[in-house]
């Protein structure tokens, strides 16, 4: 018996559980026979990629379908139009594309006339923008025009004072200017309330008159500050010299 045969017989007598190298080699060989791969350097089993059937992600898609007869899924259907203004995949979804591809603009609620809106189950009429804007402008203007009564009282007080007072004429001038500008502002507010802001020409005129009224209110405010600074007081009227002749 040769030495090689003797070594082979001795190795056959060794249990497999005591020789870890032999066990590992046996496992690698068995795995390789079933499709595994063995790294030549580390003798470890490599994972061999296998072709698996692809799953369609759209099978369990819970997005709504466009009701155009073709069951086009997704929320993007109809956003991009093809020839004829229809959505993708040959659907019959009509897409209204404005000029230049811009998003269509919607008017303010109530701008095109009075309508109705449901609030807590109750139909509430929407006020007309014209009437609302006019009432708001008139209310703001009338709050400023309330100063007219105070100026009228101040004018009466100055006229009852002697003209010898040093602030008599400045006070008379400022009070008169305040009253005149307040009357002009009131006329402008009344004219501004007559225009229809739905009309392009009327809204330009109303805007111009509104600018004039704002300027007039500013002038009235400045003039009344000057009136407060140059107040006429009867106690400070200089006494007339007595006639000694």
Curated annotation (Swiss-Prot):
| Extracellular-side segments | 1-170, 233-245
Q: Where is this region: Disordered?
A: 32-101
Q: Which Pfam families match?
A: Ninjurin
- Region of interest: Helix alpha2: 149-165
> Per the record, what is one GO cellular component?
extracellular region
BP GO annotations: cell adhesion; cytolysis; killing of cells of another organism; programmed cell death; tissue regeneration
Under the heading InterPro entries, the entry gives: Ninjurin (IPR007007)
Protein family: Belongs to the ninjurin family.
| Protein name according to UniProt | Ninjurin-A
Q: Which organism is it from?
A: Drosophila melanogaster (Fruit fly)
């Amino acid at each position: 018996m040769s030495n090689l045969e003797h070594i082979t017989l001795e190795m056959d007598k060794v249990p497999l559980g005591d020789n870890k190298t032999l066990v590992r080699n046996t496992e690698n060989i068995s795995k390789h026979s079933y499709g595994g791969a063995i790294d030549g350097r580390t003798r470890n089993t490599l994972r061999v990629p296998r072709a698996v059937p692809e799953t369609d992600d759209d099978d369990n898609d819970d997005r709504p379908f466009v009701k155009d007869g073709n069951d086009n899924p997704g929320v993007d259907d109809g956003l991009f139009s093809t020839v004829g203004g229809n959505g993708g995949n040959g659907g019959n979804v009509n897409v209204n594309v404005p000029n230049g591809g811009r998003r269509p603009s919607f008017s303010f609620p109530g701008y095109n006339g009075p309508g109705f809106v449901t609030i807590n189950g109750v139909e509430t009429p929407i006020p007309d923008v014209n009437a609302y804007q006019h009432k708001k402008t008139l209310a703001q203007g009338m709050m400023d025009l309330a100063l007219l009564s105070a100026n009228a009282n101040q004018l009466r007080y100055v006229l009852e004072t002697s003209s010898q007072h040093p602030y008599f004429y400045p006070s008379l001038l400022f009070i008169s200017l305040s009253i005149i500008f307040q009357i002009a502002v009131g006329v402008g507010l009344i004219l501004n309330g007559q225009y229809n802001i739905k009309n392009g020409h009327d809204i330009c005129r109303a805007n111009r008159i509104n600018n004039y009224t704002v300027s007039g209110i500013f002038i009235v405010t400045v003039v009344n500050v000057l009136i407060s600074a140059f107040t006429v007081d009867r106690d400070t009227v200089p006494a007339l010299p007595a006639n000694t002749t």
